[in-house]
Design a protein with these regions (language model features):
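Structural motif
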Residues: 95, 117-118
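Acetyl-CoA-dependent GNAT
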Residues: 8-77, 88-90, 94, 143-153
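Active-site acidic-Proline motif in GNAT/NAT acetyltransferases
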Residues: 75-81, 106-107
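Extreme N-terminal starter segment of soluble prokaryotic enzymes
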Residues: 2-6
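Residue-level detector of high-confidence beta-strand sites
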Residues: 57, 123-125
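C-terminal "cap" of GNAT-fold acetyltransferases
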Residues: 101, 105-109, 118, 128-154
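Conserved GNAT acetyl-CoA-binding A-motif
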Residues: 88, 94-106
């Protein structure tokens, strides 16, 4: 059985974090941007390691009791084994935010379904939000005050 480790973003792992993000997302941020996040008290980011190999990440900004998921991703070979869920659990616990928000490409049905299983609801749309290719963003929100983390939508 694989050993999963979820570790906070630090200056020591920032380059691995940035490489992992770049391998998952076409529009990933630069190493310098992630270095700034390490210094930002509103940032909560985690790197997932599976048997010591970088497998995924989550980046969240928290302000005034609200959390915005900037990016989340899991490398293809590590998908569907629960890593994204573990990243969310760790972020939920660390952020202590009641309201959570994210945007997702309208065509990313797998991600939308996953977020809905976590309890997120569709709350809006941003027209032509993404580029390369141009695509709408589905806005999703979760109110943890009214949602028990131990209960999963079936």
């Amino acid at each position: 059985m694989a050993v999963l480790t979820i570790t906070p973003l630090t200056i020591d792992n920032v380059e691995l974090f940035a490489r992992t993000a770049a391998n998952i997302l076409p529009e990933a941020w630069s190493v310098e941007t992630y270095k700034k996040q390490v210094q930002n008290p509103d940032d909560i980011s985690f790197l997932a390691l599976c048997d010591g190999e970088a497998a995924g990440f989550i980046s969240v900004w928290c302000v005034c009791g609200e959390a915005e998921i900037n990016n989340i991703g899991v490398l293809e070979k590590f998908r569907r084994i629960g890593i994204a869920g573990k990243l969310f659990e760790r972020a939920f616990a660390a952020a202590k935010a009641e309201k959570w928000y994210l945007e997702v490409r309208e065509s990313n049905n797998a991600a939308i379904s996953f977020y809905e299983k976590l309890g997120f609801d569709r709350v809006g749309m941003r027209k032509n939000f993404y580029c390369d290719p141009t695509e709408n963003a589905v806005l999703m929100a979760l109110d943890l005050e009214n949602y028990c983390l131990m209960e999963k939508k079936q």
